[in-house]
């Protein structure tokens, strides 16, 4: 084969690689990572919008919005950060499914951006791209992130807190120390599970060769004081409300036999390993020709990477140990926001370059997989139209519209308040009048009966046919509240002319006092 024919054979490959090479060059110029994240957000919002045409928002997302309707420093179930963010988002965007899909993906993109802020301290453009691409092969930044809740809100906070702590440890500057305290406090206000990240900071610092220099400085103590001060309003709320920081978690996950707790802890660790498997296997394939060099690099990690690895190990090892001690259960999902540490260290540990050809191929494969997910999104929508979600998500909007019609057949006044389980909470989102949602276990209810002032303004309760406790509760209310009207109606989703599985909804309405 002549030289000219060889070049002709290679040319088509060069052409398909050219856009990816331009992108990789753009990372060093500052636009490559933001551009990739913008494409990521756009594609995944489109995927979620199509895939969930036959399903409404996840209850966790609706709960975040519902809690945010009242500004407070906490709630009976969660610390307040996710509800604050949902409230702020709802002031800028309409209350629609697509806007909260956008919130979820923007939050996820900020998490990836925060990881890149750490990575750029150790590696250049191609490896920063490699890290981003490997993180996208975790089931974290799309599937875990798509329900905006107390877990997802930590995706940007954990890497940001880690960056601030890393800079504080390295420089011992008061600015970074204060930032580490503030962002760590924000992470705890996102979910109390973030206390394990703070423990990781402390243990990693204690195990590091430069621990004496760090702890002899003001940095760790400034971080601790600033973080504690940032949590004072929330602590005051807990003291005055009577809600303990772990009441809900222990009620929902505690009280199991020690064997069950140990099994849960083991499954947690196995789940973490399984979640990390794919990106680490991909990386292993890429570095395999130089595995001896890579092994040597791992044995001589940079001090900063050693600190990050120590933090990651602590956040994986300590939670299952606490689970066994408290005799509770745990799920690997709770660790998702910290798994970036292992992928980051694995990529940044290598001192040799990774083939740009390999990075181009991984970028092309990642883009192709995302486009394939978009192409298959209608299949998921069709499947869910025939096989409803277990949370009842197929019926939220339909039930809200039908109850609204039934309500206004009885009263011209807007529905003021709705109570019940998940369906009732979703009604407060999907009803165009957005009635307030009050859970039946709210302290203002007496023996499950809403206060008289609530009933006089107009109140309703709704339950799906399989919510046995809810159905029993509304029957009890109907027997003691004068003027209560019981209703039963059927709702059936439709997707592209295909009828879905119908569901029965039971409702109780109390029109406002004249």
Regions found by a protein language model. Give the residues of each.
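Membrane-proximal, lumen/periplasm-facing interface regions of secretory-pathway glyco-
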Residues: 54, 328-332, 354-412, 420-437, ...
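Hydrophobic/aromatic-rich transmembrane helices and adjacent perimembrane loops
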Residues: 71, 306-309, 324-361
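Transmembrane-helix motifs of polytopic, lipid-linked glycan transferases
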Residues: 102-123, 160, 164
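Short helix- or helix-capping micro-motifs
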Residues: 40-41, 131-139, 143, 184, ...
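Membrane-interface transmembrane helices that cradle and orient dolichyl/undecaprenyl
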Residues: 120-121, 125, 161-177, 350
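Short acidic/glycine- and proline-prone juxtamembrane loop motifs at membrane-interface regions
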Residues: 143-154
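Transmembrane-lumen/periplasm boundary regions of multi-pass, lipid-linked membrane glycan transferases
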Residues: 198-303, 315, 320
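Transmembrane-helix signature of polytopic, membrane-embedded enzymes
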Residues: 115-137, 155-156
């Amino acid at each position: 084969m002549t030289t000219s024919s060889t070049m002709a054979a290679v040319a088509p490959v060069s052409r398909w690689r050219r856009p990816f090479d331009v992108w990789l060059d753009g990372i060093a110029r500052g636009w490559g990572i933001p551009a990739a994240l913008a494409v990521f957000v756009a594609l995944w919002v489109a995927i979620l919008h199509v895939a969930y045409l036959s399903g409404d928002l996840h209850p966790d997302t609706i709960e975040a919005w519902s809690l945010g309707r009242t500004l407070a420093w906490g709630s009976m179930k969660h610390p307040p950060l996710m509800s604050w963010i949902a409230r702020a988002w709802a002031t800028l965007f309409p209350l629609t499914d697509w806007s909260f899909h956008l919130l979820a993906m923007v939050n996820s993109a900020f998490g990836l951006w925060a990881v890149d802020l750490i990575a750029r301290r150790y590696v250049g453009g191609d490896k920063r791209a490699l890290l981003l691409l490997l993180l996208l092969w975790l089931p974290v930044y799309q599937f875990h992130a798509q329900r905006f809740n107390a877990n997802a809100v930590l995706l940007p906070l954990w890497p940001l807190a880690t960056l601030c702590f890393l800079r504080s440890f390295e420089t011992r500057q008061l600015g970074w120390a204060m930032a580490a305290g503030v962002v760590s406090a924000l992470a705890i206000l996102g979910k109390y599970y973030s206390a394990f990240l703070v423990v990781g900071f402390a243990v990693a610092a204690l195990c590091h060769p430069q621990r004496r220099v760090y702890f002899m400085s003001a940095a760790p103590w400034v971080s601790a004081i600033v973080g504690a001060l940032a949590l004072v309003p929330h602590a005051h709320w807990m003291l005055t409300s009577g809600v303990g920081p772990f009441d809900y978690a222990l009620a929902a996950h505690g009280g199991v036999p020690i064997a069950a707790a140990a099994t849960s802890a083991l499954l947690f660790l196995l789940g973490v390993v399984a979640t990390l498997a794919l990106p680490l296997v991909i990386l292993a394939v890429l570095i395999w020709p130089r595995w001896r060099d890579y092994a040597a690099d791992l044995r001589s990690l940079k001090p900063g990477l050693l600190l990050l690895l120590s933090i990651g190990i602590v956040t994986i090892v300590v939670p299952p140990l606490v689970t066994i001690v408290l005799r509770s259960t745990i799920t690997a999902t709770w660790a998702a926001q910290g798994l970036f540490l292992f992928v980051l260290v694995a990529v940044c540990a290598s001192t040799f370059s990774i083939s740009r050809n390999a990075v181009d191929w991984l970028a092309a494969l990642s883009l192709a997989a995302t486009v394939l997910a978009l192409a298959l999104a209608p299949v998921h929508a069709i499947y869910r139209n025939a096989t409803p979600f277990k949370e009842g998500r197929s019926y939220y909007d339909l039930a809200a519209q039908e109850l609204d019609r039934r309500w206004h057949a009885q009263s011209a006044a807007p529905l003021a308040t709705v109570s019940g389980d998940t369906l009732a909470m979703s009604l407060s989102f999907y009803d165009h009048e957005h009635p307030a949602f009050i859970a039946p276990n709210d302290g203002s209810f007496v023996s499950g009966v809403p206060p008289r002032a609530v009933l006089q303004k107009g109140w309703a309760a709704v339950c799906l046919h399989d919510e046995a406790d809810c159905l029993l509760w509304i029957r009890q209310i109907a027997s003691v509240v004068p003027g209560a009207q019981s209703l039963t109606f059927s709702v059936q989703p439709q997707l592209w002319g295909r009828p879905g599985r119908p569901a029965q909804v039971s409702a109780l309405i109390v029109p406002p006092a004249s």
